[in-house]
């Protein structure tokens, strides 16, 4: 985290000073959130894990419910609608969905440890959960969160004992779905191009990549 904050400061201080006359404004803002995040992590770690097991399906249902709300009342930014803004707080429901996937997967696996080699308990419930979340994220659209959650689900299934034959099939299916996503969402092609050739659009799509390169170079 410390290294990330230092890299952020190195990449943002010039632009921050140009816009706000305070070179550390972006750094300080992120530092505050980092400290708050550590506090939340500590509080969560103090909660008995049995509580998460009992509330796992409720957490998952709440996260899916929030994702359903995004297309209707979400805040649009950069051509995508990913945030919910309730005035006193704004957040991306996809972050809660990640937590919901972890809790629900762990609870199901703990209850059916001996049946993880079967389709019914080793594949079906997880594919249904990931499928619902992936479709809702597709509507936003939110490619990065989709990939993270799918990868997270795959890792949990692997650790949980899902048969490798099913895992290979899911990887193939996942690659096909990602290909379809890239073909149907035009903005992703622009982002890939900006990643490969950031100098072609240094003030917009290529800005973050170039600033990261400046940070590494300095």
List each language-model region with its residue ranges.
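N-terminal signal-anchor transmembrane alpha helix
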Residues: 1-7, 176
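Short glycine-rich loop/turn motifs that provide flexible caps or phosphate-binding loops at active sites
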Residues: 3, 36, 73, 160, ...
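Membrane-helix boundary/helix-loop-helix interface segments in multi-pass membrane proteins
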Residues: 6-141, 202, 209
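Hydrophobic, glycine- and aromatic-enriched re-entrant/interface helices and adjoining loop segments
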Residues: 77-83, 166-218
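Hydrophobic residues in alpha-helical segments
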Residues: 109, 113, 138-139, 157-159, ...
């Amino acid at each position: 985290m410390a290294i990330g904050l230092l890299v952020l400061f190195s990449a943002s201080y010039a632009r921050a000073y140009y816009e706000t006359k305070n070179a550390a404004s972006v750094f300080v803002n992120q530092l505050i959130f980092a400290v708050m995040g550590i506090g939340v992590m500590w509080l969560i770690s103090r909660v008995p894990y049995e509580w998460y097991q009992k509330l796992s399906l409720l957490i998952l249902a709440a996260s899916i419910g929030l994702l359903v709300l995004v297309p209707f009342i979400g805040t649009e930014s950069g051509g995508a609608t990913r945030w919910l803004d309730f005035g006193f707080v704004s957040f991306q429901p996809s972050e809660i969905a990640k937590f919901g996937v972890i809790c629900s997967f762990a609870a199901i696996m703990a209850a059916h440890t001996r049946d993880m080699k079967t389709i019914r308990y080793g594949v079906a419930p997880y594919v249904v959960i990931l499928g619902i979340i992936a479709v809702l994220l597709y509507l936003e659209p939110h490619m990065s969160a989709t990939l993270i959650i799918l990868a997270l689900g795959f890792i949990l299934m692997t650790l949980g004992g899902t048969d490798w034959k099913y895992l290979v099939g899911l990887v193939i299916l996942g690659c096909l779905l990602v290909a379809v996503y890239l073909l149907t969402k035009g903005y992703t092609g622009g982002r890939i191009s900006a990643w490969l050739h950031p100098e072609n659009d240094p003030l917009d799509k290529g800005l973050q990549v170039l600033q990261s390169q400046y940070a590494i170079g300095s």
